[in-house]
Amino acid sequence: MPEPHAVLYVTNELSHIVKNGFLPIWKLTGDESLNDLWLENGKYATDVYAYGDVSKWTIRQLRGHGFIFISTHKNVQLADIIKTVDVRIPREVARSHDMKAFENEIGRRRIRMRKGFGDALRNYAFKMAIEFHGSEAETLNDANPRLHKIYGMPEMPPLYMEYAEIGTRFDDEPTDEKLVSMLDYIVYSAEEVHYVGCGDLRTLMQFKKRSPGRFRRVLWHVYDPIAPECSDPNVIVHNIMVDSKKNILKHMNFLKRVERLFIWDVSSDRSQMNDHEWETTRFAEDRLGEEIAYEMGGAFSSALIKHRIPNSKDEYHCISTYLFPQPGADADMYELRNFMRLRGYSHVDRHMHPDASVTKVVSRDVRKMVELYHGRDRGRFLKKRLFEHLHIVRKNGLLHESDEPRADLFYLTNRCNMGLEPSIYEVMKKSVIATAWVGRAPLYDYDDFALPRSTVMLNGSYRDIRILDGNGAILFLMWRYPDIVKKDLTYDPAWAMNFAVSLKEPIPDPPVPDISLCRFIGLRVESSVLRVRNPTLHETADELKRMGLDLSGHLYVTLMSGAYVTDLFWWFKMILDWSAQNKEQKLRDLKRSAAEVIEWKEQMAERPWHVRNDLIRALREYKRKMGMREGASIDSWLELLRHL
């Protein structure tokens, strides 16, 4: 059966280009009815180009159809908003008539648009959940460390510890300058940072520009004789040389329970020193930083200390939890960073990191670390791994038990969880928001397996849990939480439909057939495909109709095709309660709810769309055909329908 497709809507100045392509082309006149649009879009099994007049349709209606907006202009006029285009085509590409360049531009932008989908779900989760499972750097970037608990199983960075493997080299890309990268991976939950050796504040100001939110939530005490005055109210400059803990302690208010971080990046000038004197000085400076941090261990949650590898020592000792390479450092910079876990208050539970202690360092091993991971062409993924390792609490979400509201985004169907489907459904049942991959097309960028859509529908819907495909979830949040998910959101609806999303939300009252619930693009085609490939699948339905009875073809084909994910509980309530009303009452409920639809049969407006027995017969027939293969309980739904 075909997978979800996108409608690649181009404005008129691009319509001549798409005629040179090989995808189908859909010309819109502006005179189409709701049903015309629904039936016509349902005939396409691949992405399709479209052009013409769409000004009478709303953004939610067009997103429900899978529209992506492409133009050389900034905006497209729709019925309810002026939509910022999703893909802005450079005018030189439009003038060139180069179809490959045009389609490459669309493809590159669509990959970036995936982030908009994930960010929208995370924005909802940040409002509703405390615990976040399966987390990576994207979650840390927007989490509130004072409120949210971030769990996951991120990839390990290269670390030096006694008797431990360093790790193997991995592909990497360039990143920010070394010291900006340092602040980027170490600053997360700390509210007060004491930064010794801050220099001329250029690094701190670059970090402020890169991450203004994290910069603003920290009180910075910066220490350096050359540090200039700073106008930022959260930066306090101390023009002193730090040589003992006394220089730091007098600037700390111990009546405040805050998380503190100590950064030591001290390096004096070489001046006239010979090699031996210079190395001795450097070694002493690094050890002094460790000693000051360790002596103040009860005041700081952690410390990050400059660590230069001596040339003349095969082995030496330092106080450390981990040594690790520096993202953005030159390939010949034989200098690491020393992370020390200390005993001070922390918002993040870092008990899985060992306490800082005296550690023996073998010089050749840490030199190898530099050779494997340093270089101006490297550092982006190293920085990401360090950020995640230091600030994400390492726990498997499938095994974690807690009473806190939780979010489980983009990890449940990782290949490592194959065979754990019962646990996945249990997590989706108790999560505030969870995602699972259901797409059947080949996956090139992710290591996920697909859950069957019909099983997800039957397993995932409860009185207080909605189960929708990803596009339905975004449309639902646009409708119910317009302050969280804006109508102008840029995302790829076809990509989103490859996910099932569970939301801890009640059934809307009244239970209207909003776009988020009822789209079923291509349902008629799916039904015809079933008939022309295996007519026995429709025999019972045909016989019932000859007898003057009926079954719900919508429900039956939805389950048999495995092409859709929608919420059964809400759908059944919609059929039995809302559709049983007359036309006037139906329209009144839609208006009162501010709901929108993309399918409307005028001949059914005064009648129920189905009755209870139609739904029961559809489920029974699905059970008869697929019950031995279906992993979900169908009997529980039959029992529910008898009493709903």
UniProtKB/Swiss-Prot annotation:
UniProt xrefs under Pfam families: Orbi_VP4
Domain of life: Viruses
Record bears the keyword Heme: no
Signal sequence coordinates: none
Keyword NAD: no
Annotated compartments: Virion
UniProt keyword annotations, A-Z: Capsid protein, Outer capsid protein, Virion
Cellular component GO terms, alphabetical: viral outer capsid
Protein family (similarity comment): Belongs to the orbivirus VP4 family.
Function summary: The VP4 protein is one of the five proteins (with VP1, VP3, VP6 and VP7) which form the inner capsid of the virus.
This protein's name: Core protein VP4
